[in-house]
């Protein structure tokens, strides 16, 4: 019972990531209680399904739907739609001046990490050397996206991604110091800060004179951010809040002077007068007093970064230091995290690039059995798969950054996918590099073991991959639920909504009959990639068929079906990976890039295997009795382990 409540709570928290309700549509059989409420009754989500009781016209229905249609490709996959606006053609967002400026930065930053920064020494010292920190400040590395007028470099997201890729290639420990500072540490001030807050804090943060940290996680609050216990009580005069609490595992916690802190505050409902505790974000200065930190944590990796517990004891925070709205802290936190995930993918694309170079160097020079080992099929497959994973991650990172630079607001699922994929791909690539290098890879000197240690945290950082998988699946299912709800409402007035009903019904009937939905990437992908484009469309149709069937079966209880949601997320990730490489390789082929044929091979190889994985996953999910037995077994085995306190079976020898 407790597990079920936890699962339901997790599901609802995940669906709050974009500020929407967690209730599926009326067609799914569970209307939300209350006279004026409808499924997904908040913001844009409500607009998607809100219908007048006076049977709306087809025109008004179309208008409402058009105003709320997501441009996200990932959202579209759950609905069986090819939403190509943000993925084709592969975006080129930098103008000539931006490109030239970026080129002028790439050289010095690369040389700095090759000639000045010593990643191995940083790891050994468990801190970044002061000369390195000073050099980074002189490069402007602490304020890459802060506007020029506030002392920063003023980079857009795509320019930022290119420089972060260099950092990730050379030293992930330094990358965490820089990322914890600007990707999340003061990102809230950039996104939500008032003019006064920006002018007061950003110049010194951009120069590196002051360091920032992001304080969300607590001993009792990890993935469930809404369960934080730190509190900020407003003074009777309303001029300040008194902040108490502690935060754990805070990157830059022992270095920071400025903290973005999340705490519960009492908020009065203006309509009812009821007082509820809601999360509020604050900009907190160490100089306020009452802010202390513990010793640096001893960690598996990213040892060069500072990680510490931070304590707030009766800290007086001025009311003007509220970040965003009072009670709006959850939204602030999620926007900060969503906004920064593409940078993680970009950094890890750089990490893989550096690791692949080490693996290739060893394979090209190591002789065994009278042959260079790169001539052996097993090594060739490893290198090829490493290249594919790097290509996909890099393609995702720059796709998302470009979408953001173009002003898109529908990138949350894609950003989460890029973080999941990149962190897992980098681990696989580095693990395989060690395997190719054999015993040498296990030694400290080549530095690959350090990278492997550094990488492990990235599947936990800024939203664990498990939680993000649930977010991807639940957000996609929620949007599909809105569509089903819209169809249900349209059925109340079939004549007034004939166009909508005939279009959707025809598409679904064709899909269910195995005739396809008429979707095609023909004319969108390069003709040399037409076969891979067909594989992507077929995979999307298989995926959408299963999503619809499972939503109709489970209704709102799909939030508890984590075994199912994980498998849906995996396929959504594969689908997005397919389209980003199809898009990038199509551009390279169309523009005649020197590496176009190599990219075609990477793309085709990825699409063949990804389509097979999706087909296998969806076929298994459609074999309902077997899948349900498997899921029941997982639950029972886990329960037995917990009750026993470990492994249940006895040794084969009986003692």
Swiss-Prot record:
Q: Which reaction does it catalyse?
A: a very-long-chain 2,3-saturated fatty acyl-CoA + oxidized [electron-transfer flavoprotein] + H(+) = a very-long-chain (2E)-enoyl-CoA + reduced [electron-transfer flavoprotein]; dodecanoyl-CoA + oxidized [electron-transfer flavoprotein] + H(+) = (2E)-dodecenoyl-CoA + reduced [electron-transfer flavoprotein]; tetradecanoyl-CoA + oxidized [electron-transfer flavoprotein] + H(+) = (2E)-tetradecenoyl-CoA + reduced [electron-transfer flavoprotein]; oxidized [electron-transfer flavoprotein] + hexadecanoyl-CoA + H(+) = (2E)-hexadecenoyl-CoA + reduced [electron-transfer flavoprotein]
**Positions of post-translational S-nitrosocysteine modification:** 237
Instruction: Specify the pathway.
Output: Lipid metabolism; mitochondrial fatty acid beta-oxidation
Q: Which GO terms describe its biological process?
A: fatty acid beta-oxidation using acyl-CoA dehydrogenase
Q: Which residues carry this modification: N6-acetyllysine?
A: 71, 239, 276, 278, 298, 331, 482, 550, 556
Where are the residues of the annotated region Disordered? 22-66
A Gene Ontology cellular-component term: mitochondrial inner membrane
Give the transit peptide, as a residue range.
1-40
What ranges does the record list as Polar residues composition bias? 49-59
- Give the N6-succinyllysine positions (modified residues): 71, 195, 239, 276, 278, 331, 372, 482, 556, 639
Q: Which cofactor does it need?
A: FAD
InterPro entries listed in its UniProt record: ACAD9/ACADV-like_C, Acyl-CoA_DH_CS, Acyl-CoA_Oxase/DH_mid-dom, Acyl-CoA_Oxase/DH_mid-dom_sf, AcylCo_DH-like_C, AcylCo_DH/oxidase_C, AcylCoA_DH/ox_N, AcylCoA_DH/ox_N_sf
Q: Which domain of life is it from?
A: Eukaryota
PTM comment: the record says: S-nitrosylation at Cys-237 in liver improves catalytic efficiency.
Catalytic positions?
462
Write out the ranges of the annotated region (Catalytic): 41-482
Q: What is its main location?
A: mitochondrion
Amino-acid positions noted as binding FAD in the UniProt annotation, renumbered to this chain: 214-223, 249-251, 464-466, 562
**Transmembrane domains' residue ranges:** none
Show the GO MF annotations.
acyl-CoA dehydrogenase activity; fatty-acyl-CoA binding; flavin adenine dinucleotide binding; identical protein binding; very-long-chain fatty acyl-CoA dehydrogenase activity
Subunit comment: Homodimer. Homodimerizes after import into the mitochondrion.
What is the annotated role of this protein in its UniProt record? Very long-chain specific acyl-CoA dehydrogenase is one of the acyl-CoA dehydrogenases that catalyze the first step of mitochondrial fatty acid beta-oxidation, an aerobic process breaking down fatty acids into acetyl-CoA and allowing the production of energy from fats.
The family annotation for this protein states: Belongs to the acyl-CoA dehydrogenase family.
Question: What is the protein name given in its UniProt record?
Answer: Very long-chain specific acyl-CoA dehydrogenase, mitochondrial
Its lineage reads: Eukaryota, Metazoa, Chordata, Craniata, Vertebrata
């Amino acid at each position: 019972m407790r597990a079920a409540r936890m699962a339901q709570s997790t599901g609802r928290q995940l669906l709050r990531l974009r500020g929407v309700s967690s209730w599926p549509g009326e067609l799914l059989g569970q209307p939300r209680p209350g006279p004026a409420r409808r499924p997904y009754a908040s913001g844009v989500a409500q607009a998607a399904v809100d219908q007048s009781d006076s049977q709306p016209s087809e025109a008004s229905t179309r208008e409402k739907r058009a105003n709320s249609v997501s441009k996200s490709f990932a959202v579209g996959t759950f609905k069986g739609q090819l939403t190509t606006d943000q993925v084709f053609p592969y975006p080129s967002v930098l103008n000539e001046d931006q490109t030239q400026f970026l080129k002028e930065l790439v050289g010095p930053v690369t040389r700095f990490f090759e000639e000045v920064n010593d990643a191995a020494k940083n790891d050994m010292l468990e801190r970044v050397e002061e000369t390195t920190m000073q050099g980074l400040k002189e490069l402007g590395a602490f304020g890459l996206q802060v506007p020029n007028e506030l002392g920063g470099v003023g980079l857009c997201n795509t320019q930022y991604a290119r420089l972060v890729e260099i950092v990730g290639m050379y030293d992930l420990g330094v990358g965490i110091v820089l990322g914890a500072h600007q990707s999340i540490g003061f990102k809230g001030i950039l996104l939500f800060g008032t003019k006064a807050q920006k002018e007061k804090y950003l110049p010194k943060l951009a120069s590196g004179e002051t360091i920032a940290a992001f304080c969300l996680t607590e001993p009792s609050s990890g993935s469930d951010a809404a369960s934080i216990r730190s509190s900020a009580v407003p003074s009777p005069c309303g001029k300040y809040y008194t902040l108490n609490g502690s935060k754990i595992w805070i990157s830059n916690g022992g270095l920071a002077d400025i903290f973005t802190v999340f705490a519960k505050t009492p908020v009065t409902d203006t309509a009812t007068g009821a007082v509820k505790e809601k999360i509020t974000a604050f900009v907190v200065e160490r100089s306020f007093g009452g802010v202390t930190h513990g010793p640096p944590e001893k960690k598996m990796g990213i040892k060069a970064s500072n990680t510490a517990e931070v304590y707030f004891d009766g800290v007086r925070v001025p009311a003007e230091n509220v970040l965003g709205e009072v009670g709006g802290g959850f939204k602030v936190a999620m926007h900060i995290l969503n906004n920064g995930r593409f940078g993680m993918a970009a950094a890890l694309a750089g990490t893989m690039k550096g690791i692949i170079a080490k693996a290739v160097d060893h394979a090209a020079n190591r002789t065994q059995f009278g042959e260079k080992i790169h001539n052996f099929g097993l090594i060739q497959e490893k290198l090829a798969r490493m290249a594919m994973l790097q290509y996909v991650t890099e393609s995702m990172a720059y796709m998302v950054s470009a979408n953001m630079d173009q002003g898109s607001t529908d990138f949350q699922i894609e950003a989460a996918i890029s973080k999941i994929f990149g962190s897992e791909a980098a681990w696989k690539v580095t693990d395989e590099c060690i395997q190719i290098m054999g015993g040498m890879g296990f030694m400290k000197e080549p530095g690959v073991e350090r990278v492997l240690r550094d990488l492990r945290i990235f599947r936990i950082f800024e939203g664990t991959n498990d939680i993000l998988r649930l977010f991807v699946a639940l957000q996609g299912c929620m949007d599909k639920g809105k569509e089903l709800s819209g169809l249900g409402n349209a059925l109340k007035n079939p004549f007034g909504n004939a166009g909508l009903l005939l279009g959707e019904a025809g598409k679904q009937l064709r899909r269910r009959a195995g005739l396809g939905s008429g979707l095609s990437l023909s004319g969108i992908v390069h003709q040399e990639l037409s076969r891979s484009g067909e594989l992507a469309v077929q995979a999307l149709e298989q995926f959408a068929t299963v999503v619809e069937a499972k939503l109709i079966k489970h209704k709102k209880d799909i939030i508890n079906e984590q075994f199912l949601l994980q498998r849906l997320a995996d396929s959504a990730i594969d689908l997005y990976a397919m389209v980003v490489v199809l898009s990038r390789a199509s551009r390279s082929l169309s523009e005649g890039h020197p590496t176009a044929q190599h990219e075609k091979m990477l793309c085709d190889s990825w699409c063949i295997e990804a389509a097979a994985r999706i087909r296998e996953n969806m076929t298994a999910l459609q074999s309902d009795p077997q899948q349900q037995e498997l899921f029941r077994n997982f639950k029972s085995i886990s329960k037995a382990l917990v009750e026993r306190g470990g492994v249940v079976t006895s040794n084969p020898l009986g003692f």
